[in-house]
């Protein structure tokens, strides 16, 4: 009897619970029925749209089949009739994998518009210099091609560091593929002058120093560089356009990471770090004509990891001259300074164990069978000369819109008289320059003027003037261009002075004689840079 009472009590208590559960189930069933009705309505609408689309497509196909073929010639359009171009704008999206690129071994990326691939972005990116696309210079001076030829490896290493720092700043992964930068220039020029040894005015129009540069940043530590230059010098025989050829101007590999170490290594064909040769003129300074040396060295260098601070390098290469040991070496030291963002500059000096490999020593530009043509001349020279030591001291300072450049370079021992002579004695050639410049705005365009004084000593055999006064006006009328006009006044060595240089075995060159005269030259140049 007790059990019956307990069972009846439980039944009475559980009946409300079952009633609540039944009510919840009924509500859930009604909600699902409403959702099913909505989905069925959407399905009916889509089926109707599909049927309309098929009907419209069949109608267009029937009209196209019934339309006669159009003649191949275009119909004549009445004058003034407007032709409406059909186009539309679409949103472009970048489609990239969610997985890290290293997991799939490449970087597949696509630009998508209207569910179609517009273009794929993959492989090695090729950009115009500078790498970052930062273009502060209207005149194109920030391009690779306009970086100084001396220590270009160091400046490219600094640019490479800025590139990879930019990747880190915006949170991009460091790419494991090369980044190739293209740069170049074309500088057509016209000159008018009255030379030392002629009473007639001479003129010329030439393409000038045109060049194409390729810099490939393989990673944070390694970069390769190649510069192909146009050879404007006339051939020994025939018209000068026959020598319109490109050759390797520079090419090297640089290994270094200034964020990790101030040490670096460079090997290839470069201008050795001896001298600075900075100038705003159209003409090359006499210091460059005398001592700039392009060869194939190995360079071990140090560069302060900050923008300012000390730098240095030691280098060695095989000499083109054949007398004595073939090895030549040198050292370069300097310091870059800056104060309050207004004053900046550089001071430095260098030593080289032989100046005989310099461009101005290897070729003087003399005609075949006349005066000394340089140690590298087949008809007017000889490489069997003694190696002669040289030194360089230079300084550059800029303040606000003004800049001053000073440099001296020269042999610190005399050549043998049979190698290079001046007034019958062994020559000790030297050169110096002083140049003052100022930048300003002209006709709402960036412009600059510069004046300079240059001199040489015992360099008559190298066809260099004794003194030079020079001035230039530069302006960038259009972006990435520099239009220049230069006036140059050269003074030759005296009438009583004479010089000569090494000749082929069994021959003697004609002596180079001073004229005591002056020469005036006007040059106009348009430089285009990219």
UniProtKB/Swiss-Prot annotation:
Annotated transmembrane regions: none
Chain segments annotated as coiled-coil in the UniProt record: 20-66
Disulfide bonds: none
Record key words, sorted: Coiled coil, Signal
Residue ranges with Low complexity bias: 63-75
Residues making up the signal peptide according to the UniProt record: 1-19
Family affiliation: Belongs to the UPF0422 family.
Origin species: Legionella pneumophila subsp. pneumophila (strain Philadelphia 1 / ATCC 33152 / DSM 7513)
Protein name according to UniProt: UPF0422 protein lpg2959
UniProt region (Disordered), positions on chain: 50-81
Source species, domain of life: Bacteria
């Amino acid at each position: 009897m007790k059990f019956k009472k307990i069972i009846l009590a439980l039944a009475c208590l559980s009946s409300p619970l079952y009633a609540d559960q039944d009510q919840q189930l009924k509500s859930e069933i009604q909600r699902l029925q409403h959702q099913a009705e909505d989905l069925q309505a959407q399905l009916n609408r889509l089926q109707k749209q599909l049927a309309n689309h098929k009907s419209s497509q069949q109608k267009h196909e029937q009209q196209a089949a019934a339309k006669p073929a159009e003649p191949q010639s275009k119909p004549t359009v009445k004058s003034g009739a407007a032709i409406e171009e059909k186009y539309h704008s679409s949103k472009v999206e970048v489609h990239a994998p969610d997985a890290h690129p290293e997991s799939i071994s490449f970087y597949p990326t696509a630009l998508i518009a209207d569910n179609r691939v517009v273009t794929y972005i993959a492989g090695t990116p090729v950009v115009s210099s500078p790498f970052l696309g930062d273009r502060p210079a209207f005149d194109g001076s920030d391009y690779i091609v306009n970086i100084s030829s001396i220590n270009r490896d160091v400046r490219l290493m600094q640019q490479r560091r800025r590139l990879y720092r930019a990747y880190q700043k915006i949170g991009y992964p460091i790419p494991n593929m090369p980044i190739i930068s293209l740069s170049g220039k074309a500088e057509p020029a016209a000159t008018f002058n009255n030379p030392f040894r002629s009473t007639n005015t001479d003129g010329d129009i030439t393409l000038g120093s045109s060049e194409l540069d390729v810099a490939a940043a393989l990673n944070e530590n390694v970069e390769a560089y190649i510069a192909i230059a146009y050879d404007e010098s006339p051939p020994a025989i025939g018209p000068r356009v026959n020598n319109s050829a490109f050759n390797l101007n520079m090419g090297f590999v640089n290994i270094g990471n200034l964020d990790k170490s101030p040490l670096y290594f460079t090997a290839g064909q470069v201008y050795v770090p001896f001298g600075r040769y900075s100038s705003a003129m159209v003409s090359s300074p006499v210091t460059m004509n005398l001592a700039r040396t392009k060869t194939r060295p190995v360079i071990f260098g140090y560069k302060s990891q900050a923008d300012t601070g000390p730098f240095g390098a030691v280098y060695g290469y095989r000499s083109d001259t054949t007398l004595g040991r073939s090895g030549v070496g040198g050292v370069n030291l300097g310091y870059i300074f800056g104060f309050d963002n207004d004053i900046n500059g550089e001071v430095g000096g260098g030593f080289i164990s032989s100046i005989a490999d310099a461009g101005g020593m290897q070729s003087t530009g003399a005609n075949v069978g006349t005066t000394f043509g340089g140690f590298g001349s087949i008809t007017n020279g000889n490489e069997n000369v003694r190696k002669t030591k040289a030194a360089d001291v230079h300084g550059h300072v800029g303040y606000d819109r003004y800049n001053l450049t000073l440099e001296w370079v020269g042999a610190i021992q005399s050549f043998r008289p049979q190698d290079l002579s001046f007034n019958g004695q062994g020559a000790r050639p030297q050169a110096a320059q002083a140049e003052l410049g100022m930048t300003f705005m002209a006709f709402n365009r960036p412009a600059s003027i510069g004046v300079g004084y240059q001199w040489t000593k015992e360099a008559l055999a190298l066809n260099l003037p004794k003194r030079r006064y020079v001035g230039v006006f530069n302006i960038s009328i259009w972006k990435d261009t520099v239009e220049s006009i230069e006036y140059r006044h050269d003074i030759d060595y005296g009438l009583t002075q004479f010089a000569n240089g090494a000749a082929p075995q069994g021959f003697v060159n004609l002596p180079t004689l001073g004229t005591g005269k002056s020469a005036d030259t006007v040059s106009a140049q348009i430089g285009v840079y990219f």
